[in-house]
Amino acid sequence: MSFLRPPSMEELGAAAVSRPVASERKTMPIDRVFWSHFSPNLGPGGWVTGALLVSLGLDFRFGLLAIVIGNVVGALPVALAAAIGPPTGLTQMEASRRALGRLGVRPPAFLNWIYCVGWDAVNNVPAATALIAFLSIVAGAAPPFWLALGVLATLQMVASIYGHDMVQALQKYLGAALLAAFTVIGLQSAWHGVALPHAAHPPGIATMLLAVAILASFNLSWASYSSDYTRYLPAETPPGRVVWLALAGLLGSAVPFQILGLLTAASIAEPSPTAVIASLQHAAGPLGPMVLAVIALSSITGNAFNDNTASYSLISAGVHIPRVLAAIVTALLGYGLAVAGAGRYAALYTDYLVVTMYWIAPWIGIVLADWYFGDRTVHPVPPGWTRGASIFMIVSVATILLFSTSQLYTGPVARWLGGADIGYYVGFFVAALWYGRSGARPRGWKADA
């Protein structure tokens, strides 16, 4: 039986990241596409996002509308990117070199590595907090934050060192267990804390745009990971099946969690992971320790993903070190950032991660335009910096300067729109259309060139 077969360790050398997966190793079962896009969203983040809608002034009707629209908008590019993995056999960053060139892929790859380190820290802060509370209940002793965090970070690092097969196994088997546990927690919390949120007035257009942008970014953030976990599928796998399974995984985890956050917002003191953890623990009653254990474990599925993809991205950025060393460096930096930022979690989330995600929208716009509308005639990969790479850089900087909304900086267009953040949409469509109309598409490429 497949679940009794231990996962094999991925190649440890840097060269393995830039090469396509050998055909004899492309044996991944297609159901893993669902789990690899489903399990990383299992955690308090979705609950926080749903609860945040109420603090923005949305009632249940508009909150539900924002959840559906935002998740579809954010998940569709990720699902479309997943279909690039089987025929190329490449990681998502390496696959984008057909549009950006070997040199042009380095800036987004480096940004993705930074992004993964940031998410590593964001996921681990509430997980370590939950682990400390769990141990104080069951063992009567609360370890210091740095130690609880170190235990989780070590487990995540080991999984990422082992590589693709181990990460996929965690997504499926640990993910299934977390799904069952979170279902019980969700039903229990909804039973005790459901109060449909009401608002005195319908939200304005600016508020709805901001809410949809936040929700879209929740799934869009996975766009730079997607084919990392589909490239081991056989090359002839129908792309439609890959897209639908990835879409089902993303929407099947994000939408229910955010709706529960919306429904239980009244019982949450503030839209933060710590407040969500406390609220869920209280609502669960005797199941409180299970809530804490599940939240702590949920960080392993998410951060094994982050650490593994980060190791690929660091190598794609031109840092030619063994994959195992790249994974260790990533985990250590994520650990340090989590320890340093634990006391200012909200600022870490908004000021660091939301702004850095502005590069993802134009990058994936170019990648999808190239893959679905470009010429796939086999030619060598562009060796240097393409016009597509220039478009990526220009649009990324322009959308941050004009459209971003954060505590660090608010662009003039965002101020004019009353704080509404439409930079993701503008960046995606402007980059995709500019790339498509500029004639910048390379006339095909060869994955192993």
Regions flagged by a language model, labelled:
Residues 105-139, 299-316:
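Hydrophobic transmembrane alpha-helices that form the core helical bundles
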